[in-house]
């Protein structure tokens, strides 16, 4: 717990010094998720996406965050947009991870539709 708080403080300070640093926002958002601060993490991920739509890693993590908060359509949109960007950038591994996430969310919600 203390280690996570220390990371949070260091990353927050880095972001204060460089408020437009997409990596700092992304890294801080990941640590905020670990600290159960999903709303703050979502705001940072969305800021990265708005400022730097080519930042490929944000699509998977923001999609997962949307899933956890029952924003299924937003999650689908993130995964789909991420897949398109990964194709454009020839990032096969990331594309595959996003496709798996999209397939899982579609299967989970198809199961819910039949209940």
Regions found by a protein language model. Give the residues of each.
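Alpha-helical linker/edge segments of TPR/alpha-solenoid repeat scaffolds
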Residues: 73-77, 101-115
């Amino acid at each position: 717990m203390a280690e996570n708080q220390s990371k949070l403080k260091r990353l927050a300070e880095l972001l204060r010094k460089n408020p437009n640093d997409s990596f700092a926002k992304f890294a801080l958002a990941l640590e905020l998720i670990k600290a159960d601060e999903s709303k703050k993490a979502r705001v940072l991920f969305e800021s990265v996406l708005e400022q730097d739509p080519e930042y490929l890693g944000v699509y998977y993590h923001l999609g997962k965050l949307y899933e956890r908060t029952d924003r299924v359509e937003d999650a689908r949109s993130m995964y789909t947009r991420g897949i398109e960007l990964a194709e454009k950038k020839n990032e096969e591994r990331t594309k595959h991870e996003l496709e798996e996430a999209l397939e899982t969310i579609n299967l989970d919600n198809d199961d819910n539709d039949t209940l």
